[in-house]
C-alpha cells in the first residue's frame, strides 16, 4: 500500500494471494532449487531491472536432540537456512546499487554467547552461519554496496514456532515483527552495515 513493488516468494503462495495486495507479485518458490533461483533473476530482468531491498526470511526449524537427529534433516535445515540464503543473495546482488539493503532474518539462538535451547542444534548453528556470512558480505561489498544487516529475532508467534513448540505463546505476533522488519529494511542501512541487531521483547 506504500507504493513499493514487491515480489513475495514462498513454497505456499495461497496466503499471500489471499491478501490481494497491490503491487505485489508472488509465485511458488523453493529456495533450495537452482531453477527457482533462476526464475527470480528472470523476473527481475523482465520487470524491474533494479532491486532496492532483499529480505531473506526463509527458515526451517527441526526440534530434535542432537543424538537423535539424522544427518539428512541436519542437511535439510542448512539447505534452506544457509545455502538457500547464499544462493538467492548471490542472484539478486547484481541488480542492487550502493544504497540497496540486504536484510537477513536470523535468530538470537545463532548469536555467540546467547542462551541456547536443546534440540535446536541444526537450526541455531545455521542461523549463526548466516550471521557470519552477512558480516563478511558487508566487508566484501563495502565500496560498491549494497549494505548487509541481520535481525536476530527472539520468539515470534509463527507457524514454524507453533509446529516446533506446540502450546508455546510468543510475546510478539508475526504482524508486529513484520512491521518492524519492513521499517528496518527501508531505513536501517542509513545507520548500519555489517551489524547484527537482537530483536526481542523478552529476556533472555
Please report, for each region that a protein language model flagged, where it lies by residue:
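Catalytic loop of short-chain dehydrogenase/reductase
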Residues: 103-129, 134-135, 139-143
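Conserved NAD(P)H cofactor-binding loop of Rossmann-fold oxidoreductase domains
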Residues: 57-62
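Substrate-binding pocket helix/loop in short-chain dehydrogenase/reductase
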Residues: 65-66, 73-75
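Rossmann-fold cofactor-recognition segment
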Residues: 21-35
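A short, exposed helix-loop element centered on a Lys and neighboring polar residues
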Residues: 89-90, 135
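C-terminal helical subdomain
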Residues: 143, 150-151, 166-204
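Conserved glycine-rich Rossmann-like NAD(P)H-binding loop of the short-chain dehydrogenase/reductase
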Residues: 4-16
Amino acid at each position: 500500500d506504500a507504493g513499493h513493488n514487491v515480489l513475495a516468494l514462498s513454497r505456499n503462495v495461497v496466503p499471500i494471494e489471499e491478501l490481494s495486495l497491490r503491487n505485489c507479485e508472488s509465485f511458488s518458490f523453493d529456495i533450495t532449487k537452482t531453477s527457482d533461483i533462476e526464475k527470480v533473476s528472470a523476473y527481475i530482468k523482465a520487470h524491474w531491472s533494479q532491486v532496492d531491498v532483499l529480505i531473506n526470511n526463509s527458515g526451517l526449524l527441526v526440534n530434535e536432540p542432537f543424538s537423535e537427529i539424522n544427518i539428512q534433516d541436519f542437511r535439510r535445515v542448512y539447505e534452506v537456512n544457509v545455502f538457500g540464503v547464499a544462493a538467492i543473495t548471490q542472484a539478486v546482488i547484481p541488480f542492487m546499487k550502493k544504497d540497496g539493503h540486504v536484510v537477513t532474518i536470523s535468530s538470537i539462538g545463532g548469536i555467540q554467547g546467547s542462551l541456547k535451547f536443546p534440540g535446536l542444534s541444526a537450526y541455531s548453528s545455521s542461523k549463526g552461519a548466516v550471521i557470519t556470512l552477512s558480516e563478511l558480505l558487508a566487508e566484501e561489498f563495502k565500496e560498491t554496496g549494497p549494505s548487509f544487516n541481520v535481525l536476530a529475532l527472539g520468539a515470534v508467534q509463527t507457524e514454524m514456532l507453533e509446529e516446533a513448540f506446540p502450546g508455546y505463546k510468543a510475546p510478539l505476533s508475526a504482524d508486529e515483527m513484520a512491521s518492524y522488519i519492513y521499517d528496518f529494511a527501508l531505513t536501517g542501512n542509513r545507520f548500519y552495515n555489517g551489524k547484527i541487531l537482537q530483536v526481542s521483547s523478552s529476556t533472555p
